Curated annotation (Swiss-Prot):
GO function term, MF aspect, one: mannose-ethanolamine phosphotransferase activity
Transmembrane helix listed as a keyword: yes
Annotated membrane topology: Multi-pass membrane protein
Similarity-based family: Belongs to the PIGG/PIGN/PIGO family. PIGN subfamily.
UniProt keyword list: Cell wall biogenesis/degradation, Endoplasmic reticulum, Glycoprotein, GPI-anchor biosynthesis, Membrane, Transferase, Transmembrane, Transmembrane helix
Job of this protein: Ethanolamine phosphate transferase involved in glycosylphosphatidylinositol-anchor biosynthesis. Transfers ethanolamine phosphate to the first alpha-1,4-linked mannose of the glycosylphosphatidylinositol precursor of GPI-anchor.
Encoding gene, per UniProt annotation: MCD4
Keyword Nuclease: no
Annotated protein name in UniProt: GPI ethanolamine phosphate transferase 1
GO cellular component, one term: endoplasmic reticulum membrane
Pathway: Glycolipid biosynthesis; glycosylphosphatidylinositol-anchor biosynthesis
Region listing for Disordered, in residue ranges: 715-737
Transmembrane segments: 37-57, 386-406, 418-438, 441-461, 483-503, 509-529, 533-553, 561-581, 606-626, 640-660, 679-699, 752-772, 795-815, 825-845, 862-882
Domain of life (superkingdom): Eukaryota
Length: 921
């Protein structure tokens, strides 16, 4: 017989119920609702960095210690996405991983087959051991672990939802399998020295998703029984300690509930298996689970605390070697009570029989050790936060300075660098780099230091541009009323940006903004409304339609085939209406006896093909969805047809090159129909309706902005569009020799950039939230990729998220043409605005508290950070979409009273040819 209890660990990715007389029903808070971080916390006792979820699954071993690595040998069965991580990260030959093929992870079918595979192969191992002496001897050693990764319920929950009959049937399969494996091990060993732990790496929401940090996704079961595990604590006739509203309907009020953290499970497993605690474990051994006496518990608690203190000691020594003036953690410094003294005191308590006091002292020492680890982790945070904040502020200032230099002054003022400025910036950067070199800081620190110095040095070099730009932009503000109006507008702009920050948490904020924005045309007076009544009504209705989506739950809950078909039908209807009313649309939505241009039959035929592809996408999607709902899997023909429709539809714009129709409204329709089939295939609910409403808002916005730009009697527009103050002689000369084909930006254009920014946020938050990025439904991608493939499926989901942004980039590109501004001008303004949000979210990031708070704040910051890069990328997308597009002649020539440089360009060309001047104003 072995002298140590054997350990069997069952991991399952859903909340599970299992109550027996010898089982202690407990619940555990998970650190993460994602697979990899959850398994690392469970098996290694370490809370891996959140970014680890992006490191992949199959070929990224866990590069730190684990319970498996500390065991004499571990046998594991289950998913090819999880087991290889721990097999490759352990001592060679210590972990055996038996995995099924990835083709079994089919989300279009019931997932219980995955669990049956695991149970069957465990039975085969023990059956072989009865005839294989070598294997039999290996199985009877001490400190061995059996790890059964049961993925079936997770797969079934994703595909059919946790309250489906398929899910309940899968629970029965797991119930029976657990019973059979338990009896199998009891019969094989016949010594009652096996411990069992049943738990999960994450929970699951009612709609079959996880990953967003919601309590439903981070609360998981922890059920332990067998050798070394304490019996349940019963409280007959009363509510036992530990219960709350969450467990009120379990009908287990008489049994005490014990809550632990996810990393604590690794410590529990190590103790039950008789192994050392993993070297990186930060878990606290849950003593309430153990049958051991007080002396054994006291000794185990001390060993647990010493492991944490050893981690602190090693990390502190490393920090001392790289810091010029190291500031020690006060509770563990020499000035305080020395660690050695506290450990010796605890040992003395154990030797004198004061076990309970020793346990309390060990727990307190462990908390101090965790505090020390936290202190070292955040040692440089204040300095880094200050440095990064200066960098973000420098970027905002640099972006705005560049906008003024290129798109207000058209580059007529050159940067002015001084020796003092160069010396100051160089000295600052040298001092920072020297400090980093001495401290052996990561390479990222050098980037943190470089960008603030670079940005602010560039801003200083362009100080004359800022001075001249202020005159150009604010020169018309001379009266107190104009100044008050400016301050009011600035306050409104700041308020809208702050409301967008709240919109990351409360999507309903966008509803309020759209309702307010629906009345925007009224601000230009009744004369404007009379001239553009139809356009104003269209804008109003589309804004009201958009306001409804953020009142609905994120479109990741349940699949609604009828809603999908309605969205697809309306997309088809939009295309048909265009073909019928093409002359009306291309005549700027006005009737004329003679069409503005002859009909392009090739182009109309291609539009018809795109309409057909959208209809086909809807029909194939309906067939696939119904087949999978009936548990019949994804028909191969449907999968092939879905891919054909998706690829062909995205390539359709290339066909228009044969005989293009370059009218801007036709181009918008082509882009709309290009993305429509993809959106239909990848939608599960009301996203198709959003796609139509969002497109209507964008088209209305482009036309409305142009109408306001041309409207002569709008006081706001008149102030913004009035000609700039007379240029200085040298500036005029520069402008004439280096003319720009675009007009300079004015204060009015800040509103256009703000509208773009609001619509940019709505493109994402109207159908989802930050949580929906990681907590997504697989219903849509399973119509194309039914087999689990995180990278391919993730790419499909990202494609779906990007489609609305492609629409808005194309529409902004067209609006730039209609307003006569440079293509990059408004994009650069938005890039500056976006980092105001980034800086806000940077300072509210949390790494303590609930996983919901931690995950949400980090996600907010990451998304806001990527906005800047994303906006820059959209400029290139916009240029591609609107290449060769034509707007009406009156728009291209709408320079009116403004000093648009296109007139100067014509004048320069005329003078070059020796002709008369063009007479530009």
């Amino acid at each position: 017989m072995a002298s140590f209890p054997r350990f069997r660990f069952l991991a399952i990715a859903v909340v599970f119920h299992l109550v027996k007389a010898s089982v202690d029903p407990t619940t555990r808070r998970s650190s993460s609702a994602l697979r990899r971080p959850g398994h690392v916390a469970l098996i290694a006792g370490l809370y891996e960095d959140v970014s680890a979820v992006t490191t992949g699954w199959k070929l990224n071993p866990v590069n730190f210690d684990s319970v498996f690595n500390r065991s004499r040998h571990t046998w594991s069965w289950g998913s090819p996405d999880i087991l290889p991580m721990f097999e490759q990260g352990a001592v060679p030959g210590r972990v055996d991983a038996y995995t099924y093929g990835a083709e079994l992870e089919d989300f279009s079918l019931d997932g219980f087959a995955l669990d049956l595979w695991v149970f069957d192969h465990v039975k085969e191992l023990f059956a072989e051991a009865r005839t294989n002496k070598t294997l039999n001897d290996a199985l009877r050693q001490d400190r061995i672990v059996f790890f059964l990764h049961l993925l079936g319920l997770d797969t079934t929950g994703h595909s059919f939802r946790p309250y489906s009959k398929e899910y309940l049937n899968n629970i029965k399969v797991v119930d029976k399998g657990v019973q059979e494996i338990t009896e199998l091990m009891k019969d094989f060993y016949a010594d009652d020295r096996t411990a069992f732990v049943f738990t999960a790496d994450h929970g699951m929401s009612d709609w079959g998703n996880h990953g967003d940090g919601h309590p439903d996704n981070t609360r998981t079961p922890l059920i332990a029984w067998g050798s070394g595990v304490a019996k349940p604590q019963l409280y007959p006739g009363e509510v036992a300690p530990g219960h709350d509203e969450y467990s009120s309907d379990w009908n287990l009020d008489h049994i005490r509930r014990h809550d632990v953290e996810q990393a604590d499970v690794a410590a529990l497993m190590a103790y039950l298996a008789g192994t050392e605690f993993p070297a990186n474990s930060v878990g606290e051994l849950p003593l309430s689970f153990l049958t051991a006496g007080l002396k054994e518990k006291a000794e185990a608690s001390l060993v647990n605390a010493q492991g944490i203190l050893e981690q602190y000691r090693v990390k502190e020594e490393g920090k001392k070697l790289t810091e010029l003036r190291y500031r020690p953690y006060e509770p563990l410094s020499d000035e305080g009570m020395a660690t050695e003294s506290r450990v010796a005191h605890i040992r003395q308590l154990i030797e004198t029989g004061s076990y309970e006091e020793a346990i309390e002292e060990s727990a307190a020492l462990l908390k101090v050790g965790l505090g020390g680890l936290r202190y070292l982790q955040t040692y440089d945070w204040l300095f880094l936060r200050a440095l990064i904040t200066i960098g973000y502020l420098g970027w905002v200032a640099y972006a705005l300075t560049t906008v003024i230099d290129l798109h207000v002054l058209h580059g007529r003022i050159q940067p002015s660098r001084t020796l003092i400025g160069t010396i100051i910036s160089t000295s600052a950067l040298t001092a920072l780099y020297a400090s980093f070199a001495i401290s052996k800081s990561p390479l990222t620190y050098y980037a943190y230091a470089f960008f603030p110095v670079f940005f602010w040095e560039e801003v200083y070099a362009r100080r004359e541009s800022l001075t001249e730009g202020r005159k150009e932009l604010f020169g018309h503000i001379k009266s107190s009323s104009n100044f008050v109006s400016l301050v009011f507008n600035c306050a409104v702009y700041v308020g809208i940006i702050e409301s967008l920050a709240l919109g990351y948490i409360h999507r309903e904020i966008l509803t309020i903004l759209f309702v307010i924005g629906a009345f925007w045309p009224i601000a230009y007076g009744f004369s404007f409304l009379r001239q553009h009544m139809a356009l104003s009504i269209t804008w109003f209705l589309s804004c009201i339609a958009m306001s409804t989506f953020t009142l609905l739950p994120p479109a990741m809950t349940t699949e609604d085939v009828n809603m999908i078909m309605l969205g697809g039908a309306l997309m088809v209807l939009v295309g048909i209406i265009y073909l019928i009313l093409e002359d009306f649309v291309l005549s700027d939505f006005g009737w004329s006896e003679k069409p503005s241009s002859p009909r392009n039959h090739v182009s109309r035929t291609l539009v018809g093909i795109q309409i057909g592809l959208t209809l086909l996408a809807a029909l194939v999607t309906r067939s696939s969805a119904l087949s999978m709902q009936a548990n019949q899997g994804l028909p191969r023909g449907n999968q092939v047809m879905g891919w054909v429709v998706l690829v062909v539809s995205l390539l359709m714009p290339l066909a228009y090159r044969a005989k293009p129709n370059n009218h801007y409204m036709h181009r918008i329709l082509v882009i709309f129909l290009t993305c429509a089939p993809t959106f239909v295939i990848l939608t599960i609910s009301y996203e198709g309706l959003f796609y139509i409403a969002f497109s209507a808002v964008l088209v209305s916005w482009v036309r409305l902005e142009h109408a306001i730009y041309k409207f002569p009697s709008s006081s706001a527009n008149g102030a913004a569009r009035s000609a700039p103050s007379p240029a200085k002689p040298h500036n005029l000369e520069t402008s004439q020799t280096l003319p720009s084909p675009f007009r300079p930006l004015t204060l009015r254009d800040a509103r256009v950039a703000l509208f773009f920014f609001v619509l940019f946020q709505a493109a994402f938050f109207s159908t989802g939230n930050v949580a929906s990025v990681s907590s997504f439904s697989l219903d849509s991608v399973s119509r194309l990729i039914p087999i689990f493939d995180p990278f391919s499926q993730g790419a499909m989901l990202i494609l779906k998220l990007l489609i609305p942004f492609a629409l808005i980039s194309a529409n902004l590109g067209i609006l730039n043409k209609r307003l006569g501004v440079a293509p990059s001008a408004l994009f650069m303004v938005v890039m500056a605005i976006s980092d105001i949000l980034t800086l806000y979210f940077f300072w509210v990031v949390k790494d303590e508290g609930s996983w919901l708070e931690i995950g949400s704040t980090i996600s907010h910051f990451v998304i806001a950070s990527l906005l800047c890069v994303f906006v820059a990328a959209l400029e290139g997308v916009s240029a591609m979409f609107i290449a060769g597009v034509e707007v009406s002649e009156d728009v291209d020539r709408a320079v009116g009273k403004g000093a648009v440089a296109e007139v100067l360009l014509e004048k320069t060309e005329a003078e070059r040819d020796g002709g008369a001047g063009s007479g530009g104003k």
